[in-house]
Amino acid sequence: MKTNLINKCAAVLLITICCNASLSAEAYANDQKIESFKAKDQYDVAYEFKPERMRYLLVSHDMDTGKKANAVLTTLGKDYLSNHKAAYLANIHGMPGIGRMFAIPKMKKYAHRIILGDDADLIAKFPEEVGKVTVIAISGGKVKSISYWSPGETALEDLLK
């Protein structure tokens, strides 16, 4: 009797896990509508990303790539992103608390706005190539194209035309 109950519980648990995995966010693709999202920037100021008002979204998935992207964005100036109707989202999900204690104050030194991606489901929606920043071109609130930028190796200006 106990074994039967344990087997049934295990089966229910397995089905639940499989269903949740299939419902998890899939990465955006061309012509797909991008969802609005809310997050905070490095100054702890609320930000709402509205894709219908933007032309580009840059997403760094790891700290090393983010550092390289921030170095390039700093040289381009504070208004470069806003002048190109672009936003920059840095993945901080999974960063340990002690890391945040040091990383976020460093981010405050950058003049450009850094949207802090602290939601695993949000970050999972953006395709990734290791060591590169995802650059999503947006038109009418939909993905127009997806490209990848290697900060310090290729010019961002070539992607944000």
Indicate residue ranges for each PLM-predicted region.
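Thiol/disulfide oxidoreductase modules built on the thioredoxin-like
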Residues: 50-52, 118-156
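Short active-site neighborhood of thiol/selenol oxidoreductases, capturing the structured segment around
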Residues: 49-66
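Bacterial N-terminal signal peptides
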Residues: 10-21
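A short beta-strand-turn-helix
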Residues: 37-54
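Positively charged n-region of N-terminal signal peptides that target proteins for export
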Residues: 1-8
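Short, internal strand/loop/helix patches
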Residues: 87-89, 103-130
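N-proximal helix/coil linker or "cap" segments that precede and/or mark the start of modular domains
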Residues: 19-34
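Structural microenvironment flanking redox-active thiols in thiol-disulfide oxidoreductases
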Residues: 65-106
